[in-house]
């Protein structure tokens, strides 16, 4: 069953415009990350998801959230490589990746069902 799911997922990805960032070699060191910066980035993720990816969504808002989160993802990736691994830093890295996955899924799902409601007609999506 896992094999079938992997084949299905791969066929879906092939036709999309998803361009994952290049994976660079690990260059982490022992500097301790500033937890205030981590908290600020977590707050930015929360605000972005609340304001642009809430219950009522539009293509335009989802694109804006995607762009903001992609930029933050690159910054967090650099931050992750420059500092010692810690639980708050891992939580931040996971949060931005999860937020991006939610945005991508919401953007590609144009059908309004359940608590996913697309209101593209008013904003021109």
Q: Which residues are covered by each model-predicted region?
A:
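Glycine- and aromatic-enriched mobile tails/lids
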Residues: 1-125
